[in-house]
């Protein structure tokens, strides 16, 4: 396994990270435990979760305690999303950050978090307040490093300048969506990250499953998070499937599947410290581990650029992931998602309804 520096820090992380948004539940505990143990055996030392990922933090804490492997991993978790229906149950205020961190530590059964990440942009809280709280947690030994997720370049830079001004802990990572269907972060975010020492740790490396290879034109759809959109066949999805067919040809010529090809491509991209792979089944993790050993040729990288030019996108994951949550935060109320313990703002959009976020 290859290890890379996480931005402008001394922390070294495996180039593949275990994502835990799906599958890390009590019902799926044995599979989740197998995923973590197998990942560690193959050299993966990076696990990503969030306080709003249902039972995920509790499951990870239980696994690491039972296996005694807490010291083998870099544990990252996120805060800021709605954790209740109160006016201070979300965001980047001092009150919420301190309370959220203490709650995550309890669920994770640990006395420190390696990387504590602002999950989404909070337009209501000054960056100074958020960074003051995070620096306090670093000084108190509760967290070691800080990062962002789904933040535009200018806000990350604002945070860096504030940290430098006051001598506070600074951001070392940003977690954006980045994949073969959306390369838009190459225009501004990656150049900024390279210049200012921010490690990129992409999520959605398989475009929410579109790049898994199971979604193709004329093929009967399996259950999955993209099924409803593909059945609707809006223009964005239709264009995505056309691009996917071309990418599958490249993958087959290499003798690998589309998921492995897509992950390998992303691991080869400039500025990427580690790729977050949501693996709810052990075979998904093993596919990601296989991708770690695939090195695409210069010719293959050029062919990818011809299909999806640098800085372009087919599906606007990045734009949606940044601004939609920020707009939601102007709502002061939250409601529970049916059948889960998770919350979402009450100003639900059409896409929320389609995705099943109903009361």
For the regions a language model picked out, list residue spans one by one.
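Terminal-tail/helix-coil boundary detector
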Residues: 223-249, 253, 271-272, 286-359
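Active-site beta-loop-alpha junctions enriched in small/polar residues
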Residues: 21-23, 50-52, 78-82, 118-121, ...
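N-terminal binding-site loop/beta-alpha segment at the start of enzyme catalytic domains
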Residues: 1-73, 139, 356-359
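Conserved, mostly hydrophobic/aromatic
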Residues: 6, 18, 47, 60, ...
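Glycine/proline-rich, positively charged
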Residues: 37, 41, 84-184, 188, ...
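Aromatic-lined glycan-binding groove of carbohydrate-active enzymes
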Residues: 185-223, 257
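Short, well-ordered coil/turn segments that N-cap beta-strands
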Residues: 11-16, 43-45, 69-73, 110-114, ...
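N-terminal small/glycine-rich loop or linker at the start of catalytic domains
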Residues: 7-24, 76-89, 112, 117
């Amino acid at each position: 396994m290859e290890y890379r520096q996480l931005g402008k820090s001394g922390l070294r992380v495996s180039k593949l990270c275990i994502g835990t948004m799906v599958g890390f539940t009590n019902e799926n505990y044995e599979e989740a435990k197998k995923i973590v143990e197998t990942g560690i055996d193959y050299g993966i030392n990076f696990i990503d979760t969030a306080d709003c990922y249902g039972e995920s933090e509790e499951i990870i804490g239980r696994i690491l305690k039972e296996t005694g492997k807490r010291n083998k991993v870099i544990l990252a978790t996120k805060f800021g999303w709605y954790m209740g229906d109160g006016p201070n149950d979300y965001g980047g205020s001092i009150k919420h950050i301190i309370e959220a961190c203490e709650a995550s530590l309890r669920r994770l059964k640990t006395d420190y978090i390696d990387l504590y990440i602002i999950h989404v942009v909070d337009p209501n809280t000054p960056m100074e307040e958020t960074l003051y709280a995070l620096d306090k947690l670093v000084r108190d030994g509760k967290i070691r490093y800080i990062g962002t997720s789904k933040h535009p370049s200018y806000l990350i830079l604002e945070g860096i300048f504030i940290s430098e001004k006051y001598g506070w802990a600074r951001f070392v990572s940003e977690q954006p969506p980045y994949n073969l269907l959306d390369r838009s972060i190459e225009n501004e975010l990656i150049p900024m990250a390279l210049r200012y020492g921010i490690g990129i740790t992409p999520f959605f490396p398989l475009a929410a499953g579109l790049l898994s290879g199971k979604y193709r034109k004329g093929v009967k759809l399996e259950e999955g998070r993209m099924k409803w959109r593909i059945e609707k066949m809006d223009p964005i999805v239709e264009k995505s499937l056309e691009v996917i067919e071309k990418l599958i040809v490249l993958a087959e010529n290499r003798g690998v599947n589309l998921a492995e090809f897509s992950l390998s491509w992303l691991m080869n991209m400039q500025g990427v410290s580690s790729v977050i792979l949501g693996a709810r089944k052990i075979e998904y993790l093993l596919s990601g581990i296989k991708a770690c050993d695939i090195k695409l040729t210069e010719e293959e990288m050029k062919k990818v650029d011809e299909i999806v030019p640098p800085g372009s996108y087919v599906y606007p994951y990045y734009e949606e992931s940044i601004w939609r949550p920020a707009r939601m935060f102007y709502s002061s109320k939250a409601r529970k998602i049916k059948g889960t313990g998770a919350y979402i703002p009450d100003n639900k959009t059409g896409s929320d309804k389609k995705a099943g976020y109903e009361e």
